[in-house]
């Protein structure tokens, strides 16, 4: 008996050549709608679906393959005598290949002007049903949903006259991944349309971007996946202009640097090591901002990741070229800057849009046996809700330094303390188990620069010991959430030393 293939695709990439290859192998081809028309226009002889079902395509194509003659031909177990007898009795013929990809639901809902009706109309019903049937019966049916697999199938047919069992299994597994991702997109779209924030089940789908050489350490395997919709202001959708492939740690660090630099509207440069900022500077232009970020910590910046929120010009590129860096990420690079930086063959250069995340963005964190989902911490300082409990208010320059430190501290691993002065960070204390420990690290790093600087704390002071350390170092202004039962103790210490202190009412823990 002649083998038969059913071909019905929304993505027409390579389908004409593939069907031609099937026909050359003596395989009959059944097709539908637009696919049939395309194949016939290219001189290929195919059988219309209605000839197999004995029933016309109806309801604007909504019902065409949902028929026993199709699904019987797909699901029949060929070495089961009862199945074979029933097929013969009912005049059914087996279908050995299914070549189907689904209505472009993802592409439809990505359109800015998409209507709900358009989205619903692009939910495929017959396609998923067919490919699931074929995949369930993959011992006898080869099912292809991805044009990248056309050449593999044709090569095996030419070499062996059939598709290998292992290949059929791989293709079947891809089908169920494909339909799972497709259904996840639909369920997530409808959930969002209904405004449900915490559904009883959560299905997420990501697309493989690349295999990584290894993970956080060489003994760990790792892969990089991207969200199905382009998040243009992200490392996942950044364009790499130059350099080696990104590593697992590179991606984490670049993501951290990008998150921080998005906080600033004025020209800003951020240097990151191990997902914590080691230097942040702002200026009237990107060269001045980089100079300050470098001077913030000229030791730690070595081997770091740089993010800028303005184009990298030649003058800045020449300064960047002087030290070893892993990555530079920016909205763009001037032609002259690229010429300078591309002389370092391993330096990775990425371009990306710099857009601040919205509160609608979700952050996913895996834990053993579960997944935590929360809104991104996108809250900015609201000067209308702050309070100043101390006798002295910050000066104009202190306010500038406090705002810079506050923007940075929420991106530092808790317990977090950041010192800022004259448009740059001068000390960062990260990840200590007590707040005063982080303060001591930041103060030590700042050295004499701590005199007259501003301090930001990601959470309140449980006791005034951090304030005592700040006063000893000559820090003159502090910004913190407030809310401790010992706030009055901290206020008294601040007043004793003439420190201006701001309460934001907002905590910025980062774990």
Swiss-Prot record:
Pathway: Purine metabolism; IMP biosynthesis via de novo pathway; 5-formamido-1-(5-phospho-D-ribosyl)imidazole-4-carboxamide from 5-amino-1-(5-phospho-D-ribosyl)imidazole-4-carboxamide (10-formyl THF route): step 1/1; Purine metabolism; IMP biosynthesis via de novo pathway; IMP from 5-formamido-1-(5-phospho-D-ribosyl)imidazole-4-carboxamide: step 1/1. It comes from Bacillus cereus (strain Q1). GO terms for biological process: 'de novo' IMP biosynthetic process. One of its GO terms (molecular function) is phosphoribosylaminoimidazolecarboxamide formyltransferase activity. InterPro entries: AICAR_Tfase_dup_dom_sf (IPR024051), Cytidine_deaminase-like (IPR016193), MGS-like_dom (IPR011607), MGS-like_dom_sf (IPR036914), PurH-like (IPR002695). Residues 1-145 form the MGS-like domain. Keywords: Hydrolase, Multifunctional enzyme, Purine biosynthesis, Transferase. The IMP cyclohydrolase activity resides in the N-terminal region. It catalyses: (6R)-10-formyltetrahydrofolate + 5-amino-1-(5-phospho-beta-D-ribosyl)imidazole-4-carboxamide = 5-formamido-1-(5-phospho-D-ribosyl)imidazole-4-carboxamide + (6S)-5,6,7,8-tetrahydrofolate; IMP + H2O = 5-formamido-1-(5-phospho-D-ribosyl)imidazole-4-carboxamide. GO terms for cellular component: cytosol. The lineage of its organism: Bacteria, Bacillati, Bacillota, Bacilli, Bacillales. This is Bifunctional purine biosynthesis protein PurH. Its EC number is 2.1.2.3, 3.5.4.10. Belongs to the PurH family. Pfam families: AICARFT_IMPCHas, MGS.
């Amino acid at each position: 008996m002649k083998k038969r293939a059913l071909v019905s695709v929304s993505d027409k990439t390579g389908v004409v050549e593939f069907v031609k290859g099937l026909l050359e192998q003596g395989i009959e081809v059944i097709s539908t709608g637009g696919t049939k028309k395309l194949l016939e226009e290219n001189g290929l002889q195919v059988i219309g679906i209605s000839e197999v079902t004995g029933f016309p395509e109806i309801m604007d194509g909504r019902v065409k393959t949902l028929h026993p003659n199709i699904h019987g031909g797909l699901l029949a177990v060929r070495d089961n005598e009862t199945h074979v007898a029933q097929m013969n009795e009912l005049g059914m013929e087996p279908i050995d290949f299914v070549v189907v990809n689904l209505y472009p639901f993802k592409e439809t809902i990505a359109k800015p002007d998409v209507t709900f009706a358009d989205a619903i109309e692009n939910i495929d019903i017959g396609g998923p049903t067919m490919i699931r049937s074929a995949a369930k019966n993959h011992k006898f049916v080869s099912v292809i949903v991805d044009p990248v697999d056309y050449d593999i199938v044709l090569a095996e047919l030419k070499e062996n006259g059939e598709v290998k069992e292992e290949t059929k299994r791989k293709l079947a597994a891809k089908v169920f991944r494909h339909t799972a991702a497709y259904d996840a997109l639909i369920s997530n779209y409808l959930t969002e349309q209904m405004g449900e924030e915490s559904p009883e089940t959560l299905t997420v789908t990501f697309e493989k971007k690349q295999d990584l050489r290894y993970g956080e350490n060489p003994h760990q395997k790792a892969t990089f996946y991207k969200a199905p919709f382009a998040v243009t202001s992200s490392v996942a959708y950044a364009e790499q202009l130059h350099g080696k492939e990104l590593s697992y740690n590179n991606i984490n660090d670049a993501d951290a640097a990008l998150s921080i630099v998005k906080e600033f509207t004025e020209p800003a440069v951020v240097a990151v090591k191990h997902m914590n900022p080691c230097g942040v500077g702002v200026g009237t232009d990107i060269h001045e901002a980089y100079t300050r970020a470098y001077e913030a910590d000229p030791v730690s910046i070595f081997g770091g990741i740089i993010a800028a929120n303005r184009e990298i010009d030649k003058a800045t590129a020449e300064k960047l070229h002087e030290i070893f860096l892993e990555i530079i990420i920016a909205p763009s690079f001037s032609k002259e800057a690229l010429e300078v930086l591309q002389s370092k063959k391993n330096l990775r250069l990425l371009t990306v849009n710099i857009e601040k995340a919205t509160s609608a963005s979700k952050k996913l964190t895996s834990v053993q046996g579960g997944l935590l989902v929360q809104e991104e911490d996108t809250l900015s300082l609201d000067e209308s809700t702050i309070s100043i409990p101390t006798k002295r208010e910050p000066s104009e320059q202190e306010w500038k330094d406090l705002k810079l430190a506050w923007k940075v501290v929420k991106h530092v691993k808790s317990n977090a303390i950041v010192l800022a002065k004259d448009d740059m960070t001068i000390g960062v204390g990260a990840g200590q188990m007590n707040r005063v420990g982080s303060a001591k690290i930041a103060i030590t790093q700042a050295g004499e620069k701590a005199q007259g600087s501003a301090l930001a704390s990601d959470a309140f002071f449980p006791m005034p010991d951090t304030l005592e350390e700040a006063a000893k170092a000559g820090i003159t202004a502090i910004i913190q959430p407030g809310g401790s039962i010992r706030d009055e103790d901290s206020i008294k210490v601040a007043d004793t030393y003439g420190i201006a202190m701001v309460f934001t009412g907002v905590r910025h823990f980062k774990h």
